[in-house]
Amino acid sequence: MRILLLMRGVPGSGKSTFIKEQGLEPYTLSADALRLLYASPMLDNAGRWCISQHFDKQMWPFLLQTLEERMKRGCFTVVDATNIRGRDMTAYKKLANEYKYRIYVVDFTDITIEEAKKRNLLREEYKQVPENVIERMYAQLADNKVPSGITVIKPGELSHIWYKPRDLSAYKKVIHIGDIHGCYKPLKEYLEEINPQNYYIFLGDYIDRGSENAEVLQLLLQLAALDNVTLLEGNHEANLRDYGLEDSNASKEFRMQTAPELAQAGLSRKAVYNFYRKLSQCFCYTYRGKKVLVSHGGLARMPENLSLVATAELIYGTGVYEDALDVDMSFAKHAAVNEYQVHGHRNYEGVPVEVNEHCFNLEGAVEMGGQLRALELSEDGFAVVTVGNALEYLDKKKGAKDSKANAKIENVQQLLANLAGNPLIKEKSFGVISSFNFTRDAFYNKAWDDVTCKARGLYINKRTEKIVARSYDKFFNLDERPETKLNALRHNLQFPVQALTEIS
């Protein structure tokens, strides 16, 4: 999860030993370990082996770069360094703010200078530092405090930072709501009002694909302020982050459809970004003897310590998209009799809500004409609720399908502009008529888009801007591309389907 744990103390104060004893070495970036990557131990002027600091100008930027890559995935991370000066922690604060991290400092500064010197001499020779270094750092401690916004704990208080399940037994029901994807009508049909006696958990993916993104977000902005509501972060919420920051990384679908809806509804970028900042990475709770893990993507087992699980795995789930069923089976295999999992995000096989006796899948493809899935837990146990999608939305999606592959090309002038000068398109002129075909580079590099797929036996009269002949768009094997995977085909194909065999 998004937790950064900084060690703070002079050499010999016990930082590295603490990390080892707590089993945190796999999660640690160590300044000395990185120094040893740049240079092996060297002899000092007294003939003793030591860790060289000659490459610190390269090492520190590398450590921060590595830390940022881990933060992008939401990895729990420990930084093993002295962190004596307040300014040493400024860069960490900046990254933590950008990636929604909480920072803790484990404080080893109360050890006496005599004890630190004694412990220093007990370390392996190459790990020892001169006594004057320890003395200098002790002198710096008096003038340097931990910056605001960073929580300081003692080594014996490490358990305070770990994620702990919340007891929801006082509520009448715990209600879980699956992927919404901009489908407001089925959400509102199910969620007529918020009952203060119930607790509500939304599993993420609130936007995109549907046609009512603004209405969904406006409702969730109101619910986010309630004490009995938790909103999880799904993978599509990264688009809200990018939108709020005016970043161009948002998906094309978001930029072309969702963003205009939000702007037209008067939802400011600041409000959208603040909403994203409030989203939770997961939610684990107990309810009258049951322990339930709720995440967007689903995990392969109930972790002993949720804080050590990367946020990316909580959002996208264990494994890849197609592994959802295997992951749920694994969870059930490892689960105690009272442990359960609820997730959304992926449903490659189209399984029902109750996958097995321990796992529930709330991805119902509501935006594809499926159902909004909900799961209610009360003293009577789990109960499944589904709400179908609106007919007008299905009509909208059908129209979108009809406009895709092999549809009539309406704007030939625009198509010619897209073909012209495209390095992946080969044009051959026959007077006023030109043929357009994708190049070998496009084929071997799999550089397929709307233009290269159409450039297949395509003949256009450039004077009249009319198509005189064309082949089918480039087609692909089953599972060759995301849109030809079985899970996608069940949404994209128009039935009845005619199957043909190509005889070579």
Outline where the language-model segments fall:
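Conserved substrate/cofactor phosphate-moiety recognition/catalytic segment
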Residues: 13-75, 114-118
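Conserved GTP-binding G-domain of TRAFAC-class P-loop NTPases and closely related GTPase folds
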Residues: 2-8, 13, 21, 27, ...
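Active-site neighborhood of divalent metal-dependent phosphoester bond hydrolases
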Residues: 125, 132, 209-285, 289-292, ...
